Amino acid sequence: MTAKKLKVGETGIIKEINFDNRIQYRRMMDLGFIPNEEITCCNKTFGSTAFEVKGTKYGIRNEDAINILLK
């Protein structure tokens, strides 16, 4: 399952993040999107989704959210 498939209010645990671009991968890791971290879907809009990680909310493009795999 990917982070994009979470519904508003649902929580998941990050299994891994898969980005071909090394810079994008590092950026997500720096924001706290790391394996075994809890992620909550806060809001969905056309083209992006808001997630909460470690108490901070981030707007992530849906095309990036499909690269965040959950347990």
Spans of features found by a protein language model:
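C-terminal structural segments of small proteins and small subunits
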Residues: 43-71
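Absolute protein N-terminus
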Residues: 1-2, 71
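Short, conserved secondary-structure segments in the cores of folded domains
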Residues: 2, 27-30, 48
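Conserved hydrophobic positions within beta-strands
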Residues: 14, 39-41
